[in-house]
Design a protein with these regions (language model features):
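Structural motif at transmembrane-helix junctions in multi-pass transporters
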Residues: 36-43, 91-111, 187-193
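Cytoplasmic-side transmembrane-helix entry/capping segments in multi-pass membrane proteins
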Residues: 17-18, 73-80, 128-140, 188-197
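Specific transmembrane alpha-helical segments of multi-pass solute transporters/efflux pumps
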Residues: 23-28, 62-109, 145, 224
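Small-residue-rich packing faces within the transmembrane alpha-helices of Major Facilitator Superfamily
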Residues: 25-26, 49-53, 140, 200-204
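Transmembrane alpha-helical segments that form core, pore/gating elements
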Residues: 55, 116-118, 122, 153-213
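Membrane-interface helix termini and inter-helical loops of multi-pass transporters
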Residues: 29-40, 65-68, 98, 147-161, ...
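Hydrophobic transmembrane alpha-helices of multi-pass small-molecule transport proteins
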Residues: 55, 80, 118-119, 128-150, ...
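Glycine-/small-residue-enriched transmembrane alpha-helix faces in small-molecule transporters
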Residues: 2-45, 92, 155-184, 205
Length: 225
């Protein structure tokens, strides 16, 4: 089986990663505010719905909807698995934010890129240079120190705090699995096509469990959040 290979455009990848990190930094605060009036499932469904509409417009404009025509059964299974994993990531991360603090959730979710990096080594046989290994070791040490501090505080914490932390860690694990599957799918599909399929499936799967009428009743503060 052909495996995904790095494109070598590391500067673009670094820039996109930094932009993503900046968005992630503000996300838990906005989610915590919105969760005051919406449950985690409804909020996740709405996020997927908006993303589906945006991606549909983009692909229709760029003519990218035809990319799904030549996929074999294996690729469809990969797409379905990626969709389920990302649904799990969104839902469990929101549950974590709901039961713990935005700061704690944002720090714990950093386990996700570390697991993805390790997966790239073992699954895609990516070769790391010395500097990359040093960076990976620093991140791992920082996470270990943070986790040990959290475990000390957990003994004094509430059950809700522990449940929230566990939910965020699980969200990180399933996100790493999603990211690795997505990398393999990039051999046949563009990232926009992959995300459109995932967002569409997620919005349909979560619809029966959500309460769309609550979105329409949000006040100004929570609607902007």
């Amino acid at each position: 089986m052909a495996l995904h290979q790095a494109s070598g455009r590391w500067r673009l990848g670094l820039l996109l990663a930094l932009i993503t990190a900046a968005c992630w930094a503000s996300l838990p605060i906005a989610l915590k505010v919105t969760l005051e009036q919406l449950d985690a499932i409804t909020l996740t469904w709405f996020r997927f719905l908006v993303a589906t509409v945006v991606m549909l417009g983009w692909l229709a404009w760029r003519g990218g909807l035809s990319a799904f025509g030549g996929l074999d059964r294996k690729r469809w299974w990969h797409l379905s698995a990626a969709a389920l994993l990302l649904i799990g990531n969104y839902v469990f991360y929101l549950l974590g934010v709901q039961h713990t603090t935005p700061a704690n959730a944002q720090l714990l979710i950093q386990l996700a890129p570390l697991l993805m990096a390790l997966g790239g080594i073992f699954v895609f046989r990516e070769i790391y240079q010395f500097g990359q290994w040093c960076g990976l070791a620093i991140i791992a040490c920082g996470l270990v120190l943070f986790f040990s501090d959290q475990l000390k505080g957990a003994a004094l914490g509430t059950q809700a705090y522990l449940i929230g932390s566990a939910a965020v860690i699980f969200a990180a694990v399933v996100w790493a699995g999603y990211a690795l599957i997505q990398k393999q799918l990039l051999l046949r599909l563009g990232s926009q096509s992959i995300l459109f399929f995932i967002y569409l499936v997620a919005s349909l799967v979560l619809l029966p469990f959500s309460q769309p009428q609550k979105v329409l009743s949000l006040d100004t503060k929570h609607a902007w959040a």
